[in-house]
C-alpha cells in the first residue's frame, strides 16, 4: 500500500518552533482572526508513536511491552535466513559515479578507483571515470565491494549499488542490502539515538517488520528512503546506540497469525492512536486505536492554528461553497481524528474528510476542532 509522507520525530521541534515564531508576527491591520483550530498530534497516528514509546521507556517498560501495546495481538518472531531490501536513494538523468566496488557486471574492479553507471537506451553500461566503456550490464548494473559502497553525491551505504533505467528514462539509484543493515540506517533517523534503549529496540523491530511488508514495487526497488516508507540515510547516519538496538534485536519481527505484521508508526499521536480503517480505509486487527498517555512529551501533542475568515475560506476554496460559516464534525475515529465533516458556506453545504481538511489547512494532523471567535487583530499561526 502506498502511504502518504509521514513526518519524522526530528521534524517536530523545528515545526513547533516555526509555529510559535509565526504566531509572534504582527498582524496586518486588515486581517481579522475569527477561526481557531485546536489540534493534537503530528502525522497519521496509526500504530506506535515514537514519543509515546519514548515515554513508556522512560517509565521502565521494555521494548516487548511497548510493541505489544501499540500492535494488539501480535507476537515477536524471527525471520529465517537473509532478507534483502532494495531502497531508492535518488533518480538521476546523469551518469552515477561510485567507488569502493570490487566487482560489477561480472568484471573485477579496483576499489580505489571511481567508476560510472551510464544509461544506454534501456540498458546500463559500466564505464571508467573518464567515460571509457568497460562492460555492458543489461537492464541492471550491480556493483558490490567489501560491505560498503560510496555513491558520489549521495553517500556511503552498506551492501551493493544497483542502477536501473526507470520509466522516465532516468537511472534509479538503488541500495540493495540486508534488512538488518538497512534498519541500522533507519533507527537514528526515526528516533533520536540518545533515547532509551527500550524505545530504540521497539523502533528497530517496527522498522524491520515494516520494511518486509510495505514494498512499493517500483522500478528496481521496494522502499523509498524518505517518509513515504521510512527515513534511511545509510552508513554515515548510524550511531553506536542505534546499532546496538538493531544488533540485539537482529532478525526479530512482529507476527500476526503466521505473517509479518505491517507495523506503521508515526512521530506523535496526540494522546490516542487511530485505527487503520479510519485513516486508510483498510481494517487490520492489530492496528487499532489505543491510549497513548506519554505522548504528552511531544512538542506537538497539542497545537493551535489561527486564521482570519478570508484566510480560512481561501485555504478551503476547493472544498467550500462560498465563504465559511460553520464546520460541523459529523464522524470521528477513536482518537478522535476527523473522518467526516460538513462545511457550511454562504453558497451551500459540502461534505469533506479529515484528511482533506488537514491537507487544505496545512495542519499537523486531522485531529482537529474548530472554534469561531470574536474578530480581533492577530496573525495566522500557520
Q: Language-model segments: what does each one mean?
A:
Residues 2-382:
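Conserved, single-site charged/polar hotspot
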